[in-house]
């Protein structure tokens, strides 16, 4: 990977496994190359854990079951849900943004225009 610059704070890519649901890493948004992997018992438990935080920027689901992919994508309260990948896509045509404490509104995509415009209806009767 190379060496980190001497100034600033840098974290090497890190996977933390068996993180308890009550741990700070499971409850806050961690920006950086850090993944907190948490054990779960079934699909409902996984959704409960994913939604058990005040934040909702992004989530990742790994499963081959197409029905489960769609159920979890609908049930998880996050602005983005990645299925069997993480961070793939996300071009300028796709809206980006979070839910709850992760922010309001959207960047990118047609949806982002709503934050910069005001809609108005003008009705004119001629004649």
Give, region by region, the residue ranges found by the protein language model.
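Conserved C-terminal structural/oligomerization subdomain of aldehyde/semialdehyde dehydrogenase
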Residues: 3, 10-127
């Amino acid at each position: 990977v190379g060496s980190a610059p001497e100034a600033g704070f840098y974290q090497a890519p890190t996977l933390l496994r068996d993180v308890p649901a009550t741990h700070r890493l499971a409850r806050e948004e961690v920006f950086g190359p850090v993944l907190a992997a948490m054990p779960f018992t079934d699909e409902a438990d996984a959704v409960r854990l994913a939604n058990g935080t005040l934040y909702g920027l992004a989530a990742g689901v790994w499963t081959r079951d197409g029905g489960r992919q769609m159920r979890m994508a609908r049930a998880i309260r996050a602005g983005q849900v990645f299925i069997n990948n993480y961070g793939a896509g996300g071009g300028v045509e796709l809206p980006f943004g979070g839910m709850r404490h992760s922010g309001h509104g959207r960047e990118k995509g047609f949806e982002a225009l709503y934050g910069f415009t005001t809609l108005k209806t003008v009705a004119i009767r001629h004649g």
